Structure formats: C-alpha cells, structure tokens
Amino acid sequence: MPKSKINSPEENFDSSAAAGVDRRTPVKLNASGTPRWYIVIMLGLMLLGLAWLVVNYIAGPAIPLMVTLGPWNYLIGFGLFIVGLLMTMGWK
C-alpha cells in the first residue's frame, strides 16, 4: 500500500514536546486581589441593612426615629443591603 504524503506521523512528531520542554509563555497573575477594607465595608453594609430591617420589624413602633421614617425604613434597609450586594461584583 502506498504511503500518504500528507500528515505522515514522522513529520508531525515534535521532539521538544516529547522531551517535556514547555514552550508556553508564563502568565503573570495579578496578586493584589480586593483590599480588606472593601470586603469589610461590603459585608458591613449587607449586615447593617439586614439589622435595620429586623429592628424595624421587631421594635419599630418603640423607636421614635423608626416611627418618624415610617415606610422609608424599608427603602433604607433594602438600599443598604443592595449596595452591599452590588459591591460583590467588584470583589476579586
């Protein structure tokens, strides 16, 4: 049977790959990450928003500021929580 002139295994064999030589360029990783203060503020806002809603639900009528704000308490609580959640998109 005649040999194929295209794609013969002898011609495609790379001796450097068989020898274990790595020819890829190393990629430099950004080791900076997210600063600790960012994570603290992010988690703090989420917890503060949750605490605001819980306090409003449990002791809202007994706290004069909560009574004055009325339904705005929900906007404040959910707003703080959502800002914390939006900050998670910047967390690396």
From Swiss-Prot:
This is Cell division protein CrgA. One of its GO terms (cellular component) is plasma membrane. It comes from Corynebacterium urealyticum (strain ATCC 43042 / DSM 7109). GO terms for biological process: cell division. It comes from the Bacteria. It is a multi-pass membrane protein. Keywords: Cell cycle, Cell division, Cell membrane, Membrane, Transmembrane, Transmembrane helix. Involved in cell division. It is found in: Cell membrane. The chain crosses the membrane at residues 39-59, 65-85.
